Design a protein with these regions (language model features):
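Loop-to-helix entry and N-terminal half of a specific, functionally important transmembrane alpha helix
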Residues: 52-61, 256-264, 423-456
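A membrane-periplasm/extracellular boundary helix in multi-pass inner-membrane enzymes
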Residues: 2, 10, 180, 186-190, ...
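Alpha-helical transmembrane segments of multi-pass inner-membrane proteins
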Residues: 168-192, 196, 208-215, 219-272, ...
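Long extracytoplasmic/lumenal interhelical loops at the membrane interface
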Residues: 66, 71-73, 327-406, 425-430
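Interfacial juxtamembrane loops and adjacent helix segments
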Residues: 190-217, 374-399
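Transmembrane alpha-helices of multi-pass inner-membrane enzymes
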Residues: 90-91, 283-284, 441-498, 505
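N-terminal hydrophobic segments of proteins, predominantly signal-anchor/transmembrane helices
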Residues: 49-69, 84-147, 451
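Interfacial loop-to-transmembrane-helix boundary motif in multi-pass membrane proteins
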Residues: 47-54, 59, 106-116, 154-197
Length: 507
C-alpha cells in the first residue's frame, strides 16, 4: 500500500509539536511533566478566550448598528469604536500566550505596514500641520487601514473546526430574525422608527438610501444597506457550503439548510440592493469553481447543481412571493442602468472601474498624501480641507482613496499588499480544495477575496471588519474540514489536567 502523502503542518499543529518537544526536553532535564502540561493547558485556555473575543467582535459588527439606532443613538459616535478595545485585547492575548502565527512574509508585511502607517501619519502631521481634525481623521484612518489585518492571521492560526462551525451556526440562525427585520423595514414607511431609529433629533436619525418614492432600502440590524450586504453575502456562503457538503458529513439537517436558505434569499429579495445580488452571484460562481476543482463526480455535480437550482427557484418565486419587492427592485435596476449608461460595460464596468480610477490621482496628490483619513466619508462630513481642497471629494473608489490618504508611493504599496494578500489566500484555498474537497474555503474566499481585492475595505466600517474577519475564517477553513463534526483530538496532557472545552448554547 502506498504511503499517504505528508501534509505541511498548520500553525496549530506546529504548536502541538512544540509542546511535545518541550515535554521531551523537560523530561530529559528533570522538569516535571505536570508543569509542562499545565503550561499547555493555560495556553489552550487563552486560545479559547481568543476565540470568544473574536466571536464577540463578530457579533458587535452585526449588532453595533442596532445599538446606535434603537438603544443609544446619542452615543452613536462612541459606540462605533466599541470593537477596537476588544481587538486590542485579542492582540494582547496573542502576544502574552504566543498565539500569533509563524512569521510568514505576508503576516510580517501586515505588521510592518501598520508600523509604517503610524510613522507616515506622524510625518504627515509634522509637515502638514497638526490639528484636531488631522488627529481625529488620522486615528480613524489608521484604524481603517491597519488595525484588523493582523487579526485575520491570528484567526487563521487559532480557529479550529469547532470554532468555525460555531461561527457558521451563529450566522445561519441569525438569518431568521434578520429576515423578519428586513421585511418589516421594507413594508414600513420611510420615516418610521424601525427605519430611522428612536432618536427624536433629526441629526441622530439614520436615513437610508431610497428604493422608490415610498420605500427605503432595508438595512437590517445595521445602519446602512452596505452592512446588510456583508451579512447576507456571508450567510449565503455558509448556506452553499452546507448544501454542497455530503449529508453524512454535513452536521446540519437538509430541512434546516432549506430554512436558512429561504431566509437568506428573502433578505436579498427585499433588500433592494444590486450589490447584494451580484455578490451572492459571485459566491455561487465560487461554488461552481469548487466543483471544477474538487475530487469525486458526485461532489462536482452537486457543487454545480445546487447554486443553479437555488438561482432558478429564486427567479421563479421572486415575483410570486414578493411582488412589491420584485417591482421595486426591477425599477431600481432599470434606473441605475440608465445612470450607468456612460460606463463601458454597465454595472460590471463600474465595478471594475476601481482598478484604474486611482491612476488619475497619481500625479495630482502630494507625495505623502493629504493625510490618513482625508479620503473617507468622515472627511466629507467634517468638511476637512487642505490648502482649499476637500480631499474627501477626490476619491470614490478604494484604490483612489489610498492615493489621497497615503500618496502615490505608499498608496501603491498598499494596493500591492491587498492584491498580494488575495493571491496568497487564493493559493491556500486552491491547495485546501484539492487536498480536502471541502467547500467552505472556496465559499469564504468568494466573499473575502472580492472584498480584499476591490471592496471598500478602508472606506466603510462594516466592510472593513467583515473583510478581515472572513479572510481569517477562510484561512482557518483551509487548515482542515470545518463542517465535519469530529471528536476532540487526543491530548498529550493527563485527563485531570485538561481544560474543559467551553460549550455554547448554539454549538
Amino acid at each position: 500500500m502506498p504511503a499517504e502523502p505528508t501534509l505541511r503542518r498548520a500553525p496549530r499543529e506546529l504548536s502541538d509539536a512544540l509542546v511535545s518537544a518541550r515535554a521531551r526536553f523537560a523530561s530529559a532535564s528533570g522538569v516535571s511533566g505536570a508543569a509542562v502540561a499545565v503550561g499547555a493547558g493555560v495556553r489552550e485556555q487563552a486560545r479559547r478566550r481568543f476565540v470568544m473575543v473574536v466571536i464577540a467582535v463578530y457579533l458587535l459588527a452585526i449588532f453595533e448598528g442596532s445599538i446606535r439606532k434603537y438603544v443609544a443613538p446619542q452615543f452613536g459616535q462612541y459606540i462605533f469604536f466599541v470593537r477596537d478595545p476588544i481587538v486590542v485585547y485579542a492582540f494582547l492575548l496573542c502576544t502574552r500566550h504566543a498565539l500569533w502565527p509563524r512569521a510568514t512574509p505576508m503576516f510580517v508585511a501586515s505588521v510592518a505596514i501598520a508600523v509604517l502607517g503610524l510613522f507616515w501619519f506622524l510625518l504627515q502631521s509634522a509637515l502638514g500641520g497638526f490639528s484636531d481634525t488631522r488627529l481625529l481623521l488620522g486615528v480613524y484612518g489608521w484604524r481603517s487601514y491597519f488595525l484588523y489585518a493582523p487579526l485575520a492571521f491570528a484567526i487563521g492560526a487559532q480557529f479550529d473546526r469547532t470554532d468555525l462551525l460555531r461561527v457558521a451556526r451563529i450566522t445561519l440562525w441569525l438569518t431568521l430574525p434578520v429576515a423578519v427585520l428586513v421585511a418589516a423595514q421594507f413594508f414600513s414607511p420611510i420615516d418610521s422608527v424601525i427605519n430611522v431609529g428612536i432618536a427624536a433629533e433629526k441629526e441622530l436619525q439614520f436615513s437610508g438610501l431610497g428604493l422608490d418614492a415610498e420605500r427605503v432600502r432595508a438595512t437590517g440590524p445595521f445602519t446602512s444597506g452596505v452592512g446588510l450586504q456583508q451579512f447576507v453575502a456571508t450567510a449565503f456562503a455558509f448556506v452553499l457550503a452546507y448544501a454542497i457538503r455530503p449529508a453524512p458529513k454535513r452536521g446540519l439537517g437538509l430541512a434546516a439548510v432549506a430554512v436558512f436558505a429561504a431566509a437568506t434569499l428573502s433578505c436579498i429579495a427585499l433588500s433592494g440592493s444590486r450589490g447584494t445580488l451580484l455578490q451572492c452571484v459571485l459566491i455561487g460562481a465560487g461554488a461552481i469553481a469548487f466543483g471544477l476543482l474538487a475530487r469525486g463526480a458526485a461532489l462536482k455535480l452537486k457543487a454545480v447543481v445546487v447554486p443553479l437550482v437555488l438561482a432558478a427557484m429564486a427567479v421563479a418565486l421572486y415575483p410570486v412571493l414578493f411582488p412589491e419587492g420584485y417591482a421595486a427592485f426591477t425599477n431600481r435596476w432599470a434606473a441605475a442602468a440608465t445612470v450607468e449608461a456612460g460606463f463601458q460595460g454597465g454595472v460590471i464596468g463600474r465595478a471594475l472601474f476601481g482598478f484604474i480610477d486611482f491612476l488619475r490621482l497619481f500625479d495630482a496628490v502630494p507625495m505623502l498624501g493629504y493625510g490618513l483619513g482625508y479620503g473617507g466619508n468622515a472627511s466629507i462630513l467634517l468638511h476637512a480641507s487642505v490648502d482649499g481642497i476637500e480631499p474627501g471629494k477626490l476619491a470614490e473608489t478604494d484604490f483612489a482613496r489610498h492615493m489621497v490618504d497615503l500618496g502615490p508611493v505608499f498608496g501603491l504599496g498598499y494596493i500591492v499588499f491587498r492584491l498580494g494578500f488575495a493571491a496568497w489566500l487564493g493559493r491556500a484555498v486552491w491547495a485546501a480544495t484539492r487536498r480536502t474537497a471541502e467547500p467552505l474555503p472556496m465559499m469564504l474566499f468568494a466573499y473575502a477575496g472580492y472584498v480584499v481585492v476591490i471592496g471598500q475595505l478602508t472606506g466603510h466600517g462594516s466592510i472593513n471588519v467583515y473583510g478581515w474577519l472572513f479572510a481569517g475564517f477562510c484561512l482557518a477553513a483551509c487548515r482542515g474540514t470545518p463542517l465535519a463534526p469530529a471528536p476532540s483530538p487526543r491530548s498529550a496532557m493527563p485527563r485531570a489536567l485538561q481544560a474543559p472545552r467551553a460549550r455554547m448554547p448554539w454549538a
